Swiss-Prot record:
Gene expressing this chain: kdsA
Name this protein carries in UniProt: 2-dehydro-3-deoxyphosphooctonate aldolase
InterPro entries the UniProt entry points to: Aldolase_TIM (IPR013785), DAHP1/KDSA (IPR006218), KDO8P_synthase (IPR006269)
Family: Belongs to the KdsA family.
GO cellular component, one term: cytoplasm
EC class of the enzyme, as a word: transferase
Keywords: Cytoplasm, Lipopolysaccharide biosynthesis, Transferase
A molecular-function term among this protein's GO annotations: 3-deoxy-8-phosphooctulonate synthase activity
GO biological process, one term: keto-3-deoxy-D-manno-octulosonic acid biosynthetic process
Species of origin: Escherichia coli O6:K15:H31 (strain 536 / UPEC)
Compartments reported by the entry: Cytoplasm
Upper classification of the organism: Bacteria, Pseudomonadati, Pseudomonadota, Gammaproteobacteria, Enterobacterales
Length: 284
């Protein structure tokens, strides 16, 4: 079955092409740390031959606690992104939270991301669609894979079909997430075979019901990522940090930066294997 290709400059993203890595840090903590993490990702992905897009947030507007670190904000965040692009020539993905942010962010980065908690907000979707930028839509934890077709339709109505879908797990009772591996193919089907990627980092979140920051299950990142890659996906979304225990956001779910290369070697091996198989139709 023909898969839709979404191009991010010279990077082609599709479910039947070699996977693209969307990776970096959860939130911009400092200019120097962003440069360090981006350079390490680039070194590893270039060595392994993996197409790469740098990820970081300039504002974590949905933090649980009013006291949690949010990021440097729009103006300073765009300055850091511009320096990363000038220094490394890297593609960048970041999220927007308000319609007014869509165009200023799209003027700097290559992919704008629709956060899971905001994925059904029509005004935000319309503003993002108007930019003409490549869009990454995070599937809300409370939305079924089949309902993602409605969000894609909103972007199409807004004149933008350059849409990537991303799963980050579904609510499983209170304060826990699980990943339905069957959901990936459903998301492909309802979106006209748009590229589907897997955010393994945020799927590992597991909250303390009485705590402010999210907990996580970093020790299981490789096994969950291996399971997702075995489905046959367009890309993998993974955040890393040189010192996860002291990261300003989602450290318990972050991959230790030093483990990035062996982690990606496993992911590439699985991706190469799965995409070397002939398509098998078991529906009849």
């Amino acid at each position: 079955m023909k898969q839709k290709v979404v191009s991010i400059g010279d990077i082609n993203v599709a479910n039947d092409l070699p996977f693209v890595l969307f990776g970096g840090m959860n939130v911009l903590e400092s200019r120097d740390l962003a440069m360090r993490i981006c350079e390490h990702y680039l070194t590893v992905t270039q060595k392994l031959g993996i197409p790469y897009v740098f990820k970081a947030s300039f504002d974590k507007a949905n933090r649980s606690s009013i006291h949690s670190y949010r990021g440097p904000g729009l103006e300073e965040g765009m300055k850091i992104f511009q320096e990363l692009k000038q220094t490394f020539g890297v593609k960048i993905i970041t999220d927007v939270h308000e319609p007014s942010q869509a165009q200023p962010v799209a003027d700097v980065v290559d992919v704008i991301q629709l956060p899971a908690f905001l994925a059904r907000q029509t005004d935000l979707v319309e503003a993002m669609a108007k930019t003409g930028a490549v869009i990454n839509v995070k599937k809300p934890q409370f939305v079924s894979p089949g309902q993602m077709g409605n969000i894609v339709d909103k972007f199409k109505e807004g004149g933008n079909e350059k849409v990537i879908l991303c799963d980050r797990g579904a609510n499983f009772g209170y304060d826990n997430l699980v990943v339905d591996m069957l959901g990936f193919s459903i998301m492909k089907k309802v979106s006209g075979n748009s590229p589907v990627i897997f955010d393994v980092t945020h799927a590992l979140q597991c909250r303390d019901p009485f705590g402010a920051p999210s907990g996580g299950r970093r020790a299981q990142v490789a096994e969950l990522a291996r399971a997702g890659m075995a489905v046959g996906l367009a890309g993998l979304f993974i955040e890393a940090h040189p010192d996860p225990e002291h990261a300003k956001c989602d450290g318990p779910s972050a991959l230790p930066l030093a483990k990035l290369e062996p982690f990606l070697k496993q992911m590439k091996a699985i991706d190469d294997l799965v995409k070397g198989f002939e398509e098998l139709d078991t529906s009849k």
